[in-house]
Swiss-Prot record:
Gene3D superfamilies: Ribulose bisphosphate carboxylase, small subunit. HAMAP family: RuBisCO_S_bact (MF_00859). It comes from Brassica napus (Rape). RuBisCO catalyzes two reactions: the carboxylation of D-ribulose 1,5-bisphosphate, the primary event in carbon dioxide fixation, as well as the oxidative fragmentation of the pentose substrate. Both reactions occur simultaneously and in competition at the same active site. Although the small subunit is not catalytic it is essential for maximal activity. The lineage of its organism: Eukaryota, Viridiplantae, Streptophyta, Embryophyta, Tracheophyta. Its main location: plastid. Residues 1-54 form a transit peptide. Heterohexadecamer of 8 large and 8 small subunits. This is Ribulose bisphosphate carboxylase small subunit, chloroplastic 1. The gene is RBCS1. Pfam families: RbcS, RuBisCO_small.
Length: 181
């Protein structure tokens, strides 16, 4: 029924047009594109991300325990800790103070499975600081924890309660008895 409704003008065909572009026949040989190469094999002349930059060692592989974020830096001062907590609060993360009395780093004691480490879970100091708006409140809690447990490692974590993940974690205090090995 639909075919009977077509007009005769719609069915008219036009003759094939001659194409203006030659059909694709594949890639041309490399001999058509002359390439000149530098004979200089000097590494400083190669374009790269850092060929002329003196490389620096970031992490010593032996004799230094790895803690949390920023663990490759020297210990943070009170002012630097305050700035990190301000960053945490600006991102609307919930600050929480945790401490560990024995091992302030991941270690392997109870399992040999790849990816399994002990020492990832620390004891929470009080409750997370829900509604905290000032870094001084968090640093006050760190100071109280330090007074209560002077031989404990203390860290500050930032928890995103929308995504339900820990977003940042860094060491706020290392005990004086810790030698760094």
């Amino acid at each position: 029924m639909a075919s009977s409704m077509l007009s005769s003008a719609a069915v008219v065909t036009s003759p094939a047009q001659a194409t203006m572009v030659a059909p694709f026949t594949g890639l041309k040989s490399s001999s058509a594109f002359p390439v000149t190469r530098k004979a200089n094999n000097d590494i400083t002349s190669i374009v790269s991300n850092g060929g002329r930059v003196s490389c620096m060692k970031v992490w010593p592989p032996v004799g230094k325990k790895k803690f949390e974020t920023l663990s490759y830096l020297p210990d943070l001062t009170e002012v630097e800790l305050g700035k990190e907590v301000d960053y945490l609060l600006r991102n609307k993360w919930i600050p929480c103070v945790e401490f560990e009395l024995e091992h302030g780093f991941v270690y392997r004691e109870h399992g040999s499975t790849p990816g399994y480490y002990d020492g990832r879970y620390w004891t929470m100091w009080k409750l997370p600081l829900f509604g905290c708006t000032d870094s001084a409140q968090v640093l006050k809690e760190v100071q109280e924890c330090k007074t209560e447990y002077p031989n404990a490692f203390i860290r500050i974590i930032g928890f995103d309660n929308n995504r339900q993940v820990q977003c940042i974690s860094f060491i706020a205090y290392k005990p004086p008895s810790f030698t760094g090995a």
